[in-house]
Amino acid sequence: MKRFFITLGLACTAFSLKAQVNPKEKLWQTLKAIQDNYVDSLGDDALVDAAIAGMMNQLDPHSRYFSGQQASQMQQAMSGRYAGIGIEFIVEKDTVYVTQIINGGPADKAGLLSGDRILAIDQTPVTGFSNFEVMKKIRGDKGKPINLLVHRKGNNDDITKTITRDFIVDRSIRTAYMVNDSIGYIALRIFSETTRNEMDKALIDLKARGMKSLILDLQSNGGGYVQAAIGIADEFLPKDKLVFYSVGRDKGKDYYYTGGFGQFMNGNLIVLIDQYTASASEILTGALQDWDRAVIVGRRSFGKGLMQRPVPVFDGSVLELTGARYYTPSGRSIQKPYHGSTYDDNVYTRLASGELTDVSRVHFPDSLKSTTLVAKRTVYGGGGIMPDRFIPLDTVEYNGWLQHLSEHQISSKPAFDYLDSNRTSLLTTYHDFASFNKDYQVPGYLVQRVVSAADAAGFPLQEAGKDRMLSLLSLDLKGMLASQLFTGSDYYLQVLNTDNASFKAALQLLKQPDGVKGLLAPVKEQPPKTKVKGKKK
């Protein structure tokens, strides 16, 4: 009974003070009350981080809080470079498998090879290490050496490699290549500090090789720095063209224009987008569509039209707060509605509604209708960029079984073991990627090994869509093998493009004499209807 009255007394005291305490003081009193009275000991950092997270949950979905460590990792990712040794790897059963070596990087100079197995890093065995833990051990300060214990197939003894870390450029361009004698292709994965320079070099190189038309792939590009999006728009639009404008808290508008220093202001341009194309990618796509500069191919983009500004906190953490909404040159808002619990699941909602597979299921109210600035074509705002040419989603490609293979890296070990046994013979038969991509067929037994590994992991192959899934698995394996056999480019994506519906549709448009120009042609004005005079009866 006594305990009840103590609790009640505390509650009554709190209620009596409610009107006297301002909200900020209330927060501090709550923190102190937890510190002084809660049964378990809790650190201040954990409590404050939880309080901040609670406040951020009351804002829009894109305002976020980053701890000091998270902020540092984000800055490194966006800067486009880090100090490391220049390798790609996978971790499988206590072994680190080197899958790719960056040309000219520290690992390449030290003689590390694709196919090597890393057993220990600085005398520490990698047993039990996760991908993230391996990455933390390999990355470090520029100029600081790292010692790797390596097992190489064909060698009786393990070897030690001492490699000096150097800055590695984490390229925002996944790959750039000539599809044929006149069509170039560039896949952009992120908008970072290095994106404009990378794009400049890629365009100059492709033009020197005969490029007259370009496919710019922004599929699954989640955005990045807005300044980089302006820079890429500058590559394709003349000087003083509006890229976008933003409207902030005070309702004032800021306008962002091109500078006129682009490498590809003429020539056919097609942009590939999908349901995961977001943010800075949508700014760029919207500008190119509004100025009738490019044909947009694919599916409606994600719909993120909010601009975040970082607000540093003294301990190194960062609040990334939405400070403005951005609009395309024609005045379209790209942001989809974010009130409600379905925001993060919006892509799945669109899939369930049939919107991703049937263009007739896509509906925009007339209030969201707009027109492009040159040809006066009809476009829509209010929830992403709608493409000029719709390409339905291959639902088998997003089947849960294939997703499990990717998420759990089930294909990686069979592919690596296959290369271990066949690397020399493959390189003897296929001297370069072009011949490999043209003639190589993945053997059926390798596909079956992956199917068996998936079954053992609890992901059996279902009968529905089986043939298509096996075809996609074979293509995925071919891409993996290509990326490990040949260095210097992202050959994985080049292999996958041979069966990408949006890519193939873009090629078809570019091969038609008026394919692109026809879609970008000005809308013909309909003559006014004239009344026919007749005799009154």
Kindly give the residue locations of the regions a language model identified.
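Bacterial Sec-dependent N-terminal signal peptides
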Residues: 1-23
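Cleft-lining beta-strand/loop regions that shape enzyme active-site pockets
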Residues: 18-23, 27, 31-44, 97-100, ...
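Structured segments of extracytoplasmic/periplasmic soluble domains
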Residues: 33-37, 41, 50, 54-58, ...
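Conserved functional hotspot residues or short segments at active or partner-binding sites
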Residues: 333-334, 338-537
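Extended, small/polar residue-biased N-terminal targeting/export presequences
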Residues: 21, 38-99, 145-175, 496-507, ...
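A short, compositionally biased
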Residues: 83, 141-147, 306, 320-322, ...
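Polar, glycine-rich mid-to-C-terminal structural blocks
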Residues: 280, 292, 299, 303-367
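A sequence-level detector of short linear motifs
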Residues: 127, 160, 320, 335, ...
